[in-house]
């Protein structure tokens, strides 16, 4: 059966990220730290925390030494960004983190040793056996098995997993052929900048030096996201394979992904062809989607 799902990158990826926090907050209410607060994802985290009136006693904002000292406006008040260091997590109960993998591997032990639960948006811990990889609409029960770190999946994985969930539960999924159309924002602030500045240079017929992407992104499609991996797939594509199997606890699901960078500012989209284990009509599939929370 053919199914096309269109989702917003920010809502699905960051919505999943904060939904994990909300799930935890059903059981605890305390002091929050946002790591990577000045980055592209961190700024969206702050917007969502504010728009959802997220409940907490205190909140602190942490970033690298280079960004420490910057000021952030949150809930009408100005906050100074503190430097990320071992002492920064004293009395912190929940850490919401969006950093490069190597930074995550360095600071998460500091936070966990001081009793905090780290919700990590990076890829550093996703495939570690003892770290649950959570999409709240798909496998919320796995969150109870954390040992201080809860991983959030890659954005393209999250989109696909949410669409797969009602079908997988109803009739099982044998195989998924998925194509993604991902915005430059997935590469951070530099990705957006190269799209906008490169587009202007193209229209003005001036030269522009691209650094974030392997080819010009303005008015172009780049069929490679991440580095090249086994069998000609890219690292982004292999994330979709391995992470999805872990989330569903099903190593038998066959996934054939193609990830393409497209010249739009914010949205990621996916087209999915799903082969089910048992018969399912289009009408029945539509009904499953209509009844499923999160779609």
Model feature map: region roles:
Residues 2-5, 15:
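Residue-identity detector for glycine
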Residues 26-217, 253-254, 287:
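N-terminal Rossmann-like NAD(P) cofactor-binding subdomain of oxidoreductases
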Residues 95, 184-295:
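Charged docking surfaces used in two-component/phosphorelay signaling
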